[in-house]
């Protein structure tokens, strides 16, 4: 684990807090006492979006319109600008970001906004071998109303690499986290699965982890070389609804998924 791998936690009225990777898996679910559950009703609403470093207009209105009712917002390429931090801390109990690399003004990386305080937080980074830029991932755990713990993996996969070795290597520590968690799981983000070998590596990983893929009927996901880049995988939950929002506010379209707790239908 590199020494510059950490998460920044943003909570309203508090200074930003730096969180280092936990020392062991034993702390999953024990790092902090479980507070209020992520959702008090029977649904868990999730928004997944590569926000393109907020470079386009309307990104905030999309978040306000579609993110405010979500229990989890999983962003990739999120820059911690004052506007985004203000939205996050105003509408969510916690926002955790893993800076992949520091831009001149604000760090950019994956960011998870949540309606509950995480009881576990593990930041991960992997460097792209060609551009030498890092991509980040974040593993967080939240209490559910039925006392189970939900693991959430927010990932932006490496993009430029020869072969799939580095791509698969980024998934390895995530697999270690999942292997030590017995409860439900949501793994989502921009997987940059633009080639057949990458798709094969991703599906093989999902299969090994017993994760199912969320299917979108009107599939308007961003594609590269004819293949979608953004995915949502899950375990130990039911998919109630899944849709893709078409917008010009980013070069990716947001994914909206509504889960219900409980064992998935066969």
Curated annotation (Swiss-Prot):
Keywords in alphabetical order, please: Cytoplasm
Q: Which GO terms describe its molecular function?
A: catalytic activity
Source lineage: Bacteria, Pseudomonadati, Pseudomonadota, Gammaproteobacteria, Enterobacterales
Q: What is this protein called?
A: UPF0294 protein Ent638_0743
User: What InterPro entries does the annotation carry?
Assistant: Endo/exonu/phosph_ase_sf, Endo/exonuclease/phosphatase, UPF0294
- Name of one Pfam family that matches: Exo_endo_phos
Main localization, broad class: cytoplasm
Its localization reads: Cytoplasm
Transmembrane parts of this sequence: none
Q: Name one GO cellular component term.
A: cytoplasm
Indicate the family of this protein.
Belongs to the UPF0294 family.
**The keyword Cytoplasm appears for this protein:** yes
């Amino acid at each position: 684990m590199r020494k510059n791998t950490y998460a920044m936690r943003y909570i309203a009225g508090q200074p930003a807090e730096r969180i280092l990777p936990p020392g062991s898996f034993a702390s999953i679910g024990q790092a902090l006492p479980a507070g209020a559950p992520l959702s008090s009703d029977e649904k868990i609403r999730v928004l997944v979006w590569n926000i393109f470093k907020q470079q386009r207009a309307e990104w905030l209105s999309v978040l306000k319109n579609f993110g405010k009712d979500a229990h989890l917002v999983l962003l990739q390429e999120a820059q911690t600008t004052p506007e985004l931090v203000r939205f996050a801390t105003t509408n969510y109990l916690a926002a955790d970001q893993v800076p992949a690399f520091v831009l001149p003004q604000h760090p950019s990386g994956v960011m998870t906004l949540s309606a509950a305080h995480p009881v576990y937080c593990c930041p991960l980074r992997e460097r792209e071998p060609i551009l030498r830029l890092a991509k980040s991932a974040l593993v967080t755990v939240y209490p559910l109303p039925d006392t189970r713990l939900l693991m959430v993996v927010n990932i932006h996969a490496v993009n430029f690499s020869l072969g799939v070795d580095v791509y698969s290597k980024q998934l390895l520590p995530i697999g270690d986290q999942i292997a030590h968690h017995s409860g439900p799981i949501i793994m989502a983000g921009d997987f940059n699965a633009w080639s057949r070998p990458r798709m094969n590596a991703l599906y093989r990983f999902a299969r090994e982890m017993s994760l199912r893929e969320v299917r979108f009927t009107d599939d308007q996901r961003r594609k590269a070389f004819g293949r979608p880049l953004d995915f949502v995988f899950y375990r130990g939950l039911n998919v109630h609804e899944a849709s893709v929002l078409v917008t010009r506010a980013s070069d990716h379209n947001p994914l909206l998924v509504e889960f219900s707790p409980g064992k998935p239908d066969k």
